Amino acid sequence: MSKKISDLIVTNSLESTDKFLVETEAGTKLAPVASVRTDVYNGVDLTVVFADEIAEYGDPWSWIKARARARNYAGLHVRDYIPWTLDGFTIESEIAGFEPDFECTDQELGGHIDFISRDCYPQYVQWNTSNVNQGNATNAAPYMVSNLKAWYDSKVNSLPTELRNAIISKRSLMETRYTSGQTLQSSTSWAWNDLGKLWAPHESEVFDRSVWSGKYASGNGTKYPAFADGRARLKHFGKGGGRCNWWECDAMDASATHVCYVANYGNAVNNSASNTHIAPVLGFRIG
């Protein structure tokens, strides 16, 4: 005799040999309780899982770019990663989020995937060589004229050609902090800017809010799903290295000298723009 689901007896006791009825892409299946994941998802190497599909494109970056443009994310998950090499160092770039700016920004955006390296590039880079967090007459946005952004720009030509060709620049609403002849403690407005092919994330993209940054620093910042818990905020000084501090792209509010970063404990902090013991992560957008 058939029963309605509402007529079934509720149980709080399951054995490993009991089964769930599940809907999969291949149809309705039975799944044993023992197969249900209870561990934390750490992502998979996409070049292994999709090796056959990638082979049709010749390289993983052409493949993932085609996927993003088609808005085809089947089988892809936040924290899945693609390994590659920069300056002899192994980088594992993981999916931070799918389409965080779809149809947004001042230049309407189509399908895209944002990647952030699982660990830092193993080099300390000053946010600024002088201890200031100001914009200037060329661009009032502090990050846009920072030493950190200049460092990112200097690395673009060292990227693998296939990756460089797959990346699109990231548009972002950036805080502005500049008045000729004055040193400002807080940002006074914002403006759309092109962050380039490599970048550091906003504080709001990591913590979902401004902790040390000001009200103009998170105008279009959406928290990346990869940072849903503290594990992804912990970065290491290169793959296999020790825990390290890493930069964000925001100036600290109520300070003319400090900027925002993530501490080696995973928490939001600030320090001098000229600090020499903070490393960069590698963020980029494929689309």
Named regions from a protein language model:
Residues M1-T17:
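Short, intrinsically disordered N-terminal pre-domain segments
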Residues S2-K3, D18, T28, L148, ...:
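Generic cytosolic/nucleocytoplasmic N-terminal low-complexity/intrinsically disordered segments
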Residues K3-K4, P32, H202:
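Short, structural beta-strand-to-alpha-helix junction motif
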Residues I5-D7, L21, Y265-N267:
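Sparse, context-dependent recognition of short Cys/His-centered cofactor- or disulfide-binding micro-motifs
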Residues S16-K19, I278-A279:
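Short, surface-exposed beta-edge/turn micro-motifs
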Residues V22-V40:
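Short, surface-exposed terminal/edge motifs of secreted or surface/virion proteins that either
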Residues Y41-G287:
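Collagenous Gly-X-Y triple-helix signature in extracellular proteins
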